[in-house]
Amino acid sequence: MASDNAAEQSRQDQFSGTKEVAESHRFDEARLEAYMQAHVEGFKGPLTVEQFKGGQSNPTYQLITPSRKYVLRRKPPGKLLPSAHAVDREYKVITALHNVGFAAPRTYCLCEDDSVIGTAFYIMDMVVGRVLWEPLLPGQNPATRWKIYDSLNATMAHLHSIDHVKAGLGDFGKPGNYFARQVSRWTKQYVASETQTITEMNKLMEWLPANIPSDDTVSVVHGDYRLDNTVLHPTEPKVIAVLDWELSTLGHPLGDFTYSCMQWVMPGQGTGGGTGSIATADLKALGIPTLEQYIAMYCERTNRSGIDNLDFYFAYNFFRLAGILQGIAGRVRDGTASSEHAKAMSENVRPLAEEAWKYALRAGAGS
C-alpha cells in the first residue's frame, strides 16, 4: 500500500500548483495588465503571472496582485481543431451558472482580441480551496472520503436540475440527439488527429450511432466532471467550485453522470488520462461509495428509479475519452500540446478503445 500511496502523492505533486510559464505559452504581461486595468472591476497591479501545472487542453495561469488572485484560461497557440478550446463557451456557462447560485467561479471578462496575449482568453476569480487529484483520497479518513464523494454527487445532481433556459443557456447547444451529435463530433476529431489504426475505434464508429437509447432528456452537462475538476472547501469535505467547462454543452445528464462514474470501471491507474481508477480498491474500508451506491445516490437526488443501458453509456464514454486523448496525440504530433504529460496520456487511446468495445459487446454488439 505504501508504494500506491507514493504513486498517488507523486501524481498530486505532478499536477498541483504552479510553475514558471512555459516558453511556448508566454505573452506580453504588461499588455495583459493594461487590459485588466481597463476591463476587470477593482483591479490594481502590479501583476505577476504563473502557469498551473494542470490543464492539458487550455493553458491556465494564476494572476497575482498585491490584493487578490485571478485565474486566466486561454486558447493554446498554434493550429487548432475546429470547435476545440472554446473558451468563449466556458466563459458563458460559468457566468450563467454562477449567477443562478451554482458552484462556479465569478467571471470578470472574455477577450476575443488576439492582439492582447495572442489568443482568446477569459479571467475569473481564483477560488481558494483544495484541488485533489487522487480519487482514493490519501490522507483522508473514511468518513471524510464518503462526505467528499457525497458532495461530488450532490453537486452534479444540482447541475442537472438547473433550468437551462431560465439560466440564460437555452442557446448553449442543440437540444436533443445528444449522443448522435457527440459520437459524430468525436469521430471527426479522432479521424482528424489519427496517428495509428485502431480496429475497435472503427467498429465503435459504426455501432454507437445505431444503438443510442431512446430517452432524450436535456440538461446542462459539464463534460469532464471528476474530482480534480472541482475545488473543495479549504477545511470541509464539500465542493465549492467546479472548474474546466470546456466540454460543457446542452446534453444528456446520464452521459455526463456515467462519465463521472468511469473511475469505478477504469482498468488500472492512469489509463483514463486523468480520470484515475478505483476499480481494484477496497472501497468499503476506504469509506468510498461503491458504483452501485453512487448511482443510487444520484438517482435518489434526480428522482430516477435507476439507470438502464449502463453498458452503452460506458462504451460511449470510453470511446469519447479515446477521441479526446487522440486529439491530444494529434497535438503532440503537431507540437502544440500544452502539457508535458500530454504524450503519456496520448498513449492510452488504444486501451480505452478496447475497453469501449468490451462494453459494446456486453450491450449486444456483434450478436
Where are these regions (language model features)?
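All-alpha amphipathic helical-bundle segments outside canonical DNA-binding/catalytic cores
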Residues: 173-174, 305-317
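Catalytic activation segment of kinase domains across protein kinase-like and atypical kinase folds
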Residues: 231-260, 271
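Juxta-kinase regulatory segment immediately upstream of eukaryotic protein kinase catalytic domains
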Residues: 4-43
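ATP-binding pocket architecture of kinase catalytic cores
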Residues: 46-220, 233-237
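Catalytic-loop of the protein kinase fold
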Residues: 220-222, 227
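Active-site activation/catalytic loop segments of kinase-like enzymes and analogous catalytic loops
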Residues: 255-302, 316-334
